[in-house]
């Protein structure tokens, strides 16, 4: 996960570190064996295999595995939790050297380059403060060049109000468009029912934007 809340960055680092220290990869509610909808949306952008892609809050997610499997060669994963990143590195083994790993709070991070695809599944909905959402949007604007793509998956308006002991803010494509401003045009939005490892269905929305200017 990646982001800041009123409880503070250091406390959030401790929180997520404890989550990944005390639970197995398959024991967290957001676990996906195969991140099918994320992959489908990334494919829909039409970017080439050498396109720079960043996964925000990617931590222990298996999206990076799938991107490497599909031949993408410029993948970056950013997460607030070093423990989550370590889980992915261990799972990938030697292939982890093909990925750039960044442990950082996305709301304070300064992008070192631009990306053709910015993907975020679940990190954004943990930003409960308006100033943190604004800081996130500023990073997106700096990191995604005109013509680039932004994919954000969050709990939908009828989704959970909390996750892993933390409050979340639920979104739809309209609320995301309002936060992102006029530089990003909505291309598509999808509703998604995620079934947790415990069998609970959580309602998500995924929105794909293209930077227009």
Residue ranges and their predicted role:
Residues 2-113, 127-143, 149-213:
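Class I (Rossmann-like) S-adenosyl-L-methionine-dependent methyltransferase catalytic domain
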Residues 122-126:
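Short catalytic micro-motifs in class I SAM-dependent methyltransferases
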Residues 116:
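Conserved acidic residues
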């Amino acid at each position: 996960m990646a982001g800041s809340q009123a409880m503070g960055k250091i406390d959030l680092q401790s929180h997520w570190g404890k989550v990944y220290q005390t639970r197995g990869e398959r024991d967290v509610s957001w676990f996906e064996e195969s991140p099918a909808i994320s992959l489908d949306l990334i494919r829909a952008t039409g970017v080439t295999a050498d396109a720079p892609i960043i996964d925000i809050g990617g931590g222990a997610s298996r999206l990076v595995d799938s991107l490497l499997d599909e031949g993408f060669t410029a993948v970056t994963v950013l997460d607030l939790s070093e423990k989550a990143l370590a889980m992915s590195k261990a799972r990938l083994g030697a292939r982890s050297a093909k990925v750039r790993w960044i442990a950082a709070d996305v709301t304070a991070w300064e992008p070192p380059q631009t990306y053709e695809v910015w993907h975020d599944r679940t990190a954004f909905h943990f930003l409960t403060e308006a100033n943190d959402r604004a800081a996130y949007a500023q990073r997106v604007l700096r990191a995604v060049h005109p013509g680039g793509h932004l994919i954000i998956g969050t709990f939908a308006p009828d989704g959970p109000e909390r996750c892993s002991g933390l409050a979340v803010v639920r979104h739809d494509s309209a609320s995301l468009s309002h936060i992102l401003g006029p530089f990003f045009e909505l291309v598509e939005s999808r509703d998604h029912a995620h079934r947790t490892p415990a069998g609970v269905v959580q309602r998500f929305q995924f929105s794909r934007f293209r930077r227009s200017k």
